[in-house]
């Protein structure tokens, strides 16, 4: 693991601010600060495709089609018959012998369902899409972790900003990675994390920190030309709810994604408290020698309303969208799938991805989504065995 002096000091500062050091976030109570475990193998990111799909590519019962766009699920009455798709200029139909499984994520799965005529009639009819099955919850209940990216200038310490802003630094990082699979290019930006409560009334941690030895104005921009770090903090249990709605009957058109961050007083209060806590951490003795100076959002924001506005200015997705095909009872009008991940009111159609979460997890969503996939595969195999 790559070690940054600044991150070691920040962990000390978190402990001094009342967030205890821990060795493992997965011990049952994640409150505390520690260095993250990461999905990495020999200096290269590890993912579900490498861990699950690649070993299965040669199976005779698996065909993988790349560069193909799923357009809609074809329904035969209330039964899913398969998937209409396009690959290049060629249209095709993949018939389902047993069932169809959507795993396009919290944005893609509701989009495909709506294109198939499954969803809120008010969203489909204006686009000329016949309503095959009215299901009000499709695309609703969108949740995400909004990360508030506070940034601080520092002195007397190396950050990634200095290394990335010189040709020599870039060359050395690239060479180290190419030869040894070590160095900054082998690690995610956020190596240090923390879980804590925005105020003592919360029974468990409702904030998560991602601490990065770098800073930038927005994703895709170059790093700042001065040493700095980013303390990103997110509300783990937001009460705001958004939606995903298609804007066109054209499957190539991107849907409208409306997260509605900070839409509730509760979320705005947590955001203000989170920014205040981050400032308090920055004033701890462990960081004093680096003289941190807040420049995003800036020290002038002090009131709850001012801090909530600042949170909206510096906040951005942390790429954890969930909930748009939520699991629930058939009596719940907002529910899309049942406890076996089957779409309510339809046959031979399931959704197996992060969209089925009724509420977002109090932490990163990658591992929970893998667990949903594992559970989904168990359910499918069990039903196949019962059917003979």
Cite the ranges covered by each PLM segment:
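Conserved redox-cofactor binding core of oxidoreductases
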Residues: 1-80, 149-173
């Amino acid at each position: 693991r790559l070690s940054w002096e600044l991150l070691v000091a920040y962990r000390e500062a978190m402990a001094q601010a009342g967030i205890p050091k821990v060795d493992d976030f997965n011990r049952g109570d994640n409150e505390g600060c520690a260095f993250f475990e990461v999905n990495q193998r020999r200096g290269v990111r590890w993912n579900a495709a490498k861990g699950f799909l690649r070993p299965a590519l040669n199976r005779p019962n698996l065909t993988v089609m790349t560069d193909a766009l799923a357009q809609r699920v074809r329904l035969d009455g209330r039964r899913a018959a398969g998937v209409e798709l396009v690959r290049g200029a060629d249209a095709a139909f993949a018939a389902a012998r047993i069932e169809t499984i959507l795993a396009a994520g919290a944005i893609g799965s509701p989009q495909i369902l709506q294109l198939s005529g499954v969803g809120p009639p008010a969203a489909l009819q204006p686009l000329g899409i016949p309503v095959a099955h009215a299901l009000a919850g499709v695309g609703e209940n969108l949740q995400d972790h909004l990360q508030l990216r506070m940034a601080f200038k520092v002195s007397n310490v190396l950050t990634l900003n200095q290394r990335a802003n010189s040709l020599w630094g870039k060359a050395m990082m690239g060479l180290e990675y190419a030869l040894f699979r070590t160095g900054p290019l082998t690690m995610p930006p956020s190596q240090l994390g923390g879980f804590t409560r925005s105020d003592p009334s919360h029974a468990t941690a409702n904030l998560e920190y991602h601490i990065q030895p770098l800073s930038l104005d927005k994703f895709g921009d170059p790093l700042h030309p001065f040493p700095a770090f980013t303390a990103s903090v997110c509300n783990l249990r937001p009460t705001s709810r958004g939606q995903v709605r298609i804007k066109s009957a054209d499957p190539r058109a991107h849907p409208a994604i409306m997260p509605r961050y900070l839409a509730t007083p509760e979320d705005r209060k947590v955001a203000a408290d989170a920014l205040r806590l981050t400032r308090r951490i920055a004033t701890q003795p462990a960081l004093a020698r680096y003289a941190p100076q807040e420049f995003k959002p800036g020290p002038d924001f002090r009131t709850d309303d001012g801090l909530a506005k600042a949170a909206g200015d510096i906040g951005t997705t942390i790429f954890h969208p969930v909930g748009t095909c939520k699991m629930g009872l058939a009596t719940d009008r907002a529910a899309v799938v049942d406890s076996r991940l089957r779409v309510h009111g339809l046959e031979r159609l399931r959704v197996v991805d992060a969209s089925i979460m009724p509420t977002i997890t109090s932490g990163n969503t990658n591992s929970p989504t893998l667990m949903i996939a594992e559970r989904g595969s168990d359910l499918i195999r069990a039903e196949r065995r019962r059917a003979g």
